[in-house]
């Protein structure tokens, strides 16, 4: 994209000198455990970053090293101790029905080194025009002003907030399911979002659950985000989210736990409610010790849907008692047989 490495330009020396100075000052800091030279370089970058990694592996074994974080189509870096790469990310819902069964293991199992996802997310939402007034300095949200004017010119100016909230809810759902899909993947070493907030440094990239100022937009809050992005996250493998009432809802329950220590004798419970709080099912999934790591099965949840007589949305919540770990999933149930009102039918052309 930007800096061209390996061509003898000043950037080559700079990217060696700066980590040396940084490591001299901060080498023993607990938060300094991984090092890369940068993001998405160009030029003769693979040989250069290979030398970068070799130098640091030989010089300072306190940390682990990678050349650079790169996109999915970029070359592999053979000397890396871990990879930060796109490719094992995203959802496949454009070509198949939504589900939470799948994971990314087929895309990372061929790699011997730990694999960290690159720029997970990038789900976009409609602009929040109320953000324009927050720009009180030299920078102005001129792009938002253009978008607002286009909407006004098309007689939809009053719908801007509704568009933002609707697209934002979908954005939050996509982030939830992509992060959970990552956490369901065994041996996935981690993930990094492109940004938690909107990115204003390169055109318009409304990829954030927060705005440019790291403030909430109104469609998801911190507590809701922590349900699917925390040290301990209950997970559910569900084959689909739309059912008829002659079916049985089934979910296999797992947990991703990267807390400070294993959870001893953890009791996992579930409840299934409608949007008014009526409980249709509840119980215990299981009680067991939960080790540090992911792909830890906890049990399953089954519910016959014959008692659901009208179309409605239900919500399954999974909670690990004695901890902050809780997560939930919506699903929809419809009658299998529908009686159509009889009457005269008129056709016209």
What are these regions (language model features)?
Residues 1-210:
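Substrate-binding/catalytic cleft of secreted carbohydrate-active enzymes
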Residues 138-349:
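Carbohydrate-binding surfaces of carbohydrate-active enzymes
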């Amino acid at each position: 994209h930007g800096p061209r490495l390996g061509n003898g330009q000043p950037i080559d020396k700079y990217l060696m000198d700066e980590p040396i100075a940084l490591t001299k000052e901060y080498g023993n800091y607990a938060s300094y455990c991984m090092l890369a030279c940068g993001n998405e370089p160009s030029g003769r970058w693979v040989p250069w970053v290979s030398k970068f990694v070799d130098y640091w592996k030989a010089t300072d074994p306190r940390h682990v090293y990678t050349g650079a974080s790169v996109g999915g189509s970029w070359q592999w870096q053979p000397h890396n101790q871990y990879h930060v790469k796109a490719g094992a990310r995203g959802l496949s819902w454009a070509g198949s029905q939504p589900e939470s069964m799948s994971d990314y293991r087929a895309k990372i199992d061929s790699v011997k080194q730990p694999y960290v996802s690159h720029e997970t997310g990038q789900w976009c939402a409609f602009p929040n025009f109320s953000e324009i007034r927050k720009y009180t300095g030299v920078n102005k949200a001129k792009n938002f002003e253009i978008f607002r004017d286009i909407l006004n010119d098309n007689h939809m100016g009053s719908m801007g907030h509704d568009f933002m909230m609707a697209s934002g809810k979908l954005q939050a759902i996509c982030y939830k399911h992509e992060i959970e899909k990552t956490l369901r993947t065994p041996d996935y070493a981690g993930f990094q979002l492109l940004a938690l907030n909107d990115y204003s440094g390169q055109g318009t990239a409304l990829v954030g659950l927060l705005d440019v100022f790291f403030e909430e937009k109104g469609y998801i809050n911190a507590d809701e985000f922590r349900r699917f992005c925390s040290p301990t996250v209950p997970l559910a493998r569900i084959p689909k989210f739309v059912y008829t009432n002659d079916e049985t809802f089934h979910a296999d329950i797992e947990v991703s736990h990267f807390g400070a220590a294993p959870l001893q004798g953890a009791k996992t419970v579930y409840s299934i409610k409608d949007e008014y709080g009526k409980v249709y099912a509840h119980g215990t999934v299981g009680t067991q010790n939960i080790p540090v790591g992911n792909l830890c099965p906890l049990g399953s949840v089954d519910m016959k849907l014959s008692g659901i007589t009208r179309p409605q949305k239900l919500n399954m919540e999974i909670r690990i008692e004695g901890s902050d770990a809780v997560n939930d999933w919506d699903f929809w149930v419809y009658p299998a047989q529908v009686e159509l009102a009889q009457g005269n039918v008129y056709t016209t052309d």
